[in-house]
Amino acid sequence: MALQKFPLLGLLFLITIVVSSTIAVDDPVCPTTSKLSRASFPNGFVFGTATAAFQVEGAINETCRGPALWDIFCKRNPERCSGHNADVAVDFFHRYKEDIQLMKNLNTDAFRLSIAWSRIFPHGRKEKGVSQAGVKFYHDLIDELLKNGIIPFVTVFHWDTPQDLEDEYGGFLSENIVKDFREYADYVFTEYGGKVKNWITFNEPWVFAHAGYDVGKKAPGRCSRYLKGCEDRDGRSGYEAYLVSHNLLNAHAEAVEVFRQKVKGGKIGIAHSPAWFEPHDLKDSNDVPTVSRVLDFMLGWHLDPTTFGDYPQIMKDLLGHRLPKFTSSQKAKLKDSTDFVGLNYYTSTFSNHNEKPDPSTPSWKQDSLVAWEPKNVDHSAIGSQPLTAALPVYAKGFRSLLKYIKDKYANPEIMIMENGYGDKLKDKDSVEVGTADYNRKYYLQRHLLAMNEAICIDKVRVTGYFVWSLLDNFEWQDGYNNRFGLYYVDFKNNLTRYEKESAKYYKDFLGQGVRPSALKKDEL
């Protein structure tokens, strides 16, 4: 048995003890159970899995689908898309009925999907044509989910701006996107709002703005040439990310205004993606405040406006004229413009005060006056990181982040829209190696326990949890070798799906207790 394949086996005994111990909490909404399972959570708690259109659908030349931002980015920069083949992806477009059966096999209650803008409006605007075949595909998908007792959660925008809008005016760099996004959101709410009641306007606005327009790692790959790896790029780091986010937030507010007119009894939010941070040096008076400062820049950047109507004060103070300003009417639309806080959590790191920022080379990370450190002052890593893990594993940070949101934002409803573990596998690795994902199983155990503690001990109002992802898929600039799925996809042999150990665990976890669909309305 190779340690490289199973680097966390040494922790198996400890983790088994932790997750199997009795959860004894004096709280009627948190039942006492002999081991951690669905039964350990409040009645009506929703468990599911998640994907995104560009990452799984494929079929880029079907339904009159127009080119999207990532299509062109990968075509122009193949080295940054690591084996990208969007026409195949994992072919969810043709195999969704098969994959819905995988969801049923897991005993899940819900499924988070996204609607590809360019599959509905191939050229970005209704007046330029609507693909009725694209519209029908999402109707068929949603109907199949409902037929199988699975609740659809739909993301309106998961990083797939129609390329025509990108070419016409720069996409989210222009305030023109606000009007076009409102039109698109209006259309999908009208079309699907009768049977879909749970919506997310934007997925991970921090990643979209920072990675796409500040460091250039993701589409459209814009950044200033003074940053490493950006020597041949166009862009303006330290400026464009804030402009993109400003337009995105105003687009969100406009979409929510339409949503509340069109979708009765529904809920809508944004899926945020902060890490958690621990101070690099607890004895350094400069390091401790870095945690709240970097979270204001990472989470508060988009959560403060949709809660309070404006950006965090620290961002205004440090950025000055580089941070756009909302009008009074925009603030009014943004305030309380979400019904829940969507949260994508994966990992944590250490935050170190940046003593000497260079004002001539602005960037988002430097602007927060925080350097991210993999180890603290004592040279200790945060959590654990198996040899094949994409990111450090730190479940304590998950609980800390949930409590932070409760305390700072007046205990809002929170839904975990993504939580998952990435394995960096090689092309030569076999299906047997890929499905023996014990590290992912342990990751899920530890994070489900941390979430249970946040709910039952810290009294955080978490109401749902989605594993990323149902299937191995295209992980943006990391391509296909970075696998997050509960089901292994054999990219060499007809994209065949195989159940992983983590899927078996999740199925067993969800097999104990009562599914929300089995409860009467007065019990929810």
UniProtKB/Swiss-Prot annotation:
It catalyses: Hydrolysis of terminal, non-reducing beta-D-glucosyl residues with release of beta-D-glucose. One of its GO terms (cellular component) is mitochondrion. The active site is at residues 204, 418. Coiled coil: none annotated. PROSITE patterns: ER_TARGET, GLYCOSYL_HYDROL_F1_2. It holds the Pfam family Glyco_hydro_1. Expressed exclusively in roots. GO terms for biological process: carbohydrate metabolic process; cellular response to cold; cellular response to salt stress. Belongs to the glycosyl hydrolase 1 family. Disulfide bonds join 223-230. This is Beta-glucosidase 22. One of its GO terms (molecular function) is beta-glucosidase activity. It comes from Arabidopsis thaliana (Mouse-ear cress). Component of the PYK10 complex, at least composed of PYK10/BGLU23, BGLU21, BGLU22, JAL22, JAL23, PBP1/JAL30, PBP2/JAL31, JAL32, JAL33, JAL34, JAL35, GLL22 and GLL23. The lineage of its organism: Eukaryota, Viridiplantae, Streptophyta, Embryophyta, Tracheophyta. A beta-D-glucoside binds at residues 55, 158, 203-204, 346, 418, 468, 475-476, 484. Activated upon binding to PBP1 or PBP2. Glycans are attached at residues 61, 494. A motif (Prevents secretion from ER) lies at residues 521-524. It is an enzyme of class 3 (hydrolase). Keywords: Disulfide bond, Endoplasmic reticulum, Glycoprotein, Glycosidase, Hydrolase, Signal. Induction: Up-regulated by salt, 2,4-D and methyl jasmonate. Down-regulated by cold and mannitol.
